[in-house]
A protein has these predicted regions:
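NAD(P)-dependent short-chain dehydrogenase/reductase
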Residues: 159, 170-222, 226
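C-terminal amphipathic/interface module of NAD(P)-dependent oxidoreductases
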Residues: 280-328
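SDR active-site strand-loop-helix element
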Residues: 5, 29, 54-58, 98-104, ...
Length: 328
């Protein structure tokens, strides 16, 4: 039996659906049912039910974007950094394997092939040289691997508070007990929801263009479960669709497939975006998914996954989509 924490959240709901599809016995927990942020409460509960695996899909859900985290720092810290440590301690003491949904937003930029086989890190993927390289020679740009230290964190400022807490959690739980750390990036699928990247882009008044790795949410969840079911080595995994994509390219696909009745406008440059829109730094990065693929866990190339999601797009009613930020 599997214990699923954060079952009512954006990611947790997809874990619930996939576990049901696989006919897996599981208990979907929310904080309304049990205060699993309390060590004593969670420890006693785990000892009582003895799950074979625990999934932590709980965390602070920033809405409409990560700027919201700056106004709720205590809550964000508790949900994104302290809760994973509590779960890690409980799992260590009860000898329970578990998986933690982290984030790829603890990096910024990418690695670029330089002279003599060396690599250099470029934090700004929007500079003209990098955009030209991505368009003409993408093979010279490499994503961050699981062995690269996060460079968008409290230890490597500047960063936003959300990313800082996610990196802090990884640092605290890495190597503690039998644990997986799963890193998604900018999740999307065919369902119209506020945290879906494709929904966000369709509702932004102006779009900020950059280069990113992204994750088809359903494929992310399946990949996470496959790692556990295949008894893959515990550790960190970048769970993203292979490749990278510009925001402008995604918008082009939206226009071609969905044909929305609107024009898309873009911020002219980073300076304009940060002057008039963003309150905190943003993470834009490319992640390397080779470790995942080497274990036979497959995710579709990024543009194939995007095309499929848009071809099967399901528009939701406003009441079904919009809810406040908070812990799930």
């Amino acid at each position: 039996m599997i214990l699923l924490l954060g079952a009512s959240g954006y990611v947790g709901q997809v874990f619930s659906s996939e576990l049901r599809r696989r006919r897996r016995s599981f208990i979907p927990l929310t904080r309304q049912a049990i205060d699993y942020t309390s060590f004593d409460v969670l420890f006693n509960y785990v000892r009582k039910i003895k799950p074979e695996f625990i999934i932590n899909a709980a965390g602070y859900a920033p809405k409409p974007n990560v700027d919201a985290c700056e106004l709720a720092r205590e809550e964000v810290l508790c949900a994104n950094a302290l809760l994973p440590q509590t779960i890690a301690r409980v799992c260590l003491l009860t000898n329970t394997p578990w998986g933690h949904v982290s984030s790829g937003s603890i990096y910024v930029g990418a690695k670029v092939a330089a002279e003599w086989g060396r690599m250099r890190i470029e934090r700004d993927l929007n500079q003209p040289e990098m955009r030209r390289l991505f368009a003409e020679h993408p093979e010279k740009i490499y994503g961050f691997t699981e062995w690269d230290e996060p460079n968008f964190s409290f230890r490597h400022a500047p960063c936003n508070f959300y990313s800082g807490t996610k990196a802090l959690a990884e640092e605290a739980i890495r190597g503690v007990g039998q644990s997986y750390i799963w890193r998604p990036r900018m999740p999307f699928n065919e369902r119209d929801e506020t945290r879906n990247l494709l929904s966000k882009l369709q509702h932004y008044a102006r779009v900020y263009d950059n280069v990113n790795s992204i994750s088809h949410l359903d494929e992310f969840v399946r990949a996470c479960l496959e790692l556990w079911e295949r008894q893959a080595p515990f550790g960190i995994y970048n769970v993203v669709n292979p490749g990278a994509v510009t925001t402008r390219r995604i918008v082009e696909m939206i226009q071609r497939i969905l044909k929305p009745d609107r024009r898309f406008e873009f911020w002219k440059n980073d300076e304009e975006f940060y002057r008039y829109q963003a309150k905190t730094p943003r993470s834009h990065c490319i992640l390397d998914a080779s470790k995942l693929l080497s274990l036979g866990v497959r995710m579709r190339p990024v543009e194939e996954a995007l095309e499929d999601a848009l071809e099967r797009w399901q528009t939701a009613s406003p009441s079904a989509k919009f809810a406040g930020a908070g812990v799930r």
